[in-house]
Regions:
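The conserved acidic donor/metal-binding loop of glycosyltransferases
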Residues: 116, 164, 220
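Glycine-rich adenosyl-binding loop in Rossmann-like folds that engage adenosine-containing cofactors
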Residues: 68-104, 163-209
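Conserved glycine-rich SAM-binding loop
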Residues: 118, 142, 166, 224
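S-adenosyl-L-methionine
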Residues: 1-139, 147-148, 255-259, 266-285
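Short, charged, surface-exposed secondary-structure boundary motifs
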Residues: 147-148, 170-172, 250-255
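Short, conserved SAM-binding/catalytic segment
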Residues: 148-158
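Short, well-ordered alpha-helical microsegments
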Residues: 123, 146, 168, 225-227
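Conserved acidic-Pro-Pro-aromatic motif
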Residues: 109-110, 127, 132-137, 156-158, ...
């Protein structure tokens, strides 16, 4: 326990703290340098780094690194430290954050819906953990982030849906802020670019892929979680496990209360909040 505490404290000061004081470009260079120094401990080293302009969105850039034998793309330079130990390790970190092992127990889902998949690390880890899974669907509407997830998952069988999830199928206004992973239907703080994206309901996604239960859903809709759950009616009994990030992304207000209410309406039980923003639930089907 003492070693773990020392390691965590050292990690915070060496890797995480500098992000608060350095501009993005210098922080990236710093982490690339640090990864070389600690590679003998973690067996990880950022071998190459490049920064790529995004077509149609010249104000944004994509970062690309080579760690070991794998290449990873991501949209925020301040997140580079997440990938020092590889893409699967980053996915496992997210898996733990969403308490997936806790809600699954010894069960194995028939399919996984990753709603708000970002650059795909959660889906990627799921594909490793459950190699025989019938389908994993990664849903992501942000066109900048999509370039990353398409690259990161290109060697997998994971299906990528370039849409948003809402309470209706329509073309809707969407506010783009990929560098902080805050792109949303709800205007985020700071500068954001207004675009239009295709939105679909969870019902329509489940039906498109002919998913059968039991389904595991991981959801992070940047404040749009209640509307996403509204679009789940015909197929709600196919979903057995769900884990939702209900953080304060809706004008600074958490959606936890609305999320719990919707889950109860859909017949979920064992609804549990973890920390400030993770809500998990299980349904007997």
């Amino acid at each position: 326990m003492a070693f773990k505490a020392i390691y965590q404290t050292s990690k915070n000061y060496i890797i995480n703290k500098p992000a608060f004081y350095l501009p993005e470009n210098l922080y990236v260079k710093y982490i690339v340098f640090i990864s070389t120094l600690i590679s003998f401990l973690s067996h990880s080293k950022i071998r190459t780094y490049s920064k790529i302009a995004v077509e149609n969105f010249p104000q944004y850039f994509i970062h690309k690194i080579t760690v070991g034998n794998e290449q990873i793309m991501f949209q925020n330079g301040f997140r580079i430290s997440r990938f020092i130990r590889g893409f699967d390790f980053a996915g496992e970190r997210m898996w733990r954050r969403y308490k997936i092992d806790e809600i699954l127990g010894s069960d194995i889902p028939e399919a996984i819906l990753d709603v708000g998949a970002n650059i795909g690390e959660f889906s990627y880890f799921a594909s490793i953990k459950f190699s025989g899974l019938s389908k994993i669907i990664s849903v992501e509407p942000d066109p900048v982030v999509l370039k990353c997830i398409e690259f990161n998952l290109k060697e997998t069988e994971i299906n990528i849906e370039p849409i948003a999830v809402s309470d209706k199928s329509a073309v809707l206004k969407f506010y783009l802020k990929p560098t902080s992973a805050d792109s949303s239907f709800h205007i985020p703080s700071g500068d954001a670019v207004e675009i239009e994206v295709a939105a679909r309901t969870l019902d329509s996604v489940i039906e498109k892929y002919n998913l059968s239960g039991p389904i595991l859903v991981k959801m992070d809709c940047e404040g749009h979680e209640p509307e996403a759950l509204e679009g789940l009616m015909r197929n709600k009994d196919k979903i057995k496990w769900i884990s939702i990030d209900s953080g304060p992304e809706r004008s600074g207000v958490s959606t936890t209360r609305e999320v719990i209410s919707k889950l109860r309406q859909h017949g979920f039980e064992n609804i549990t909040t973890h920390g400030f923003n993770i809500v998990t639930a299980v349904k007997q089907i």
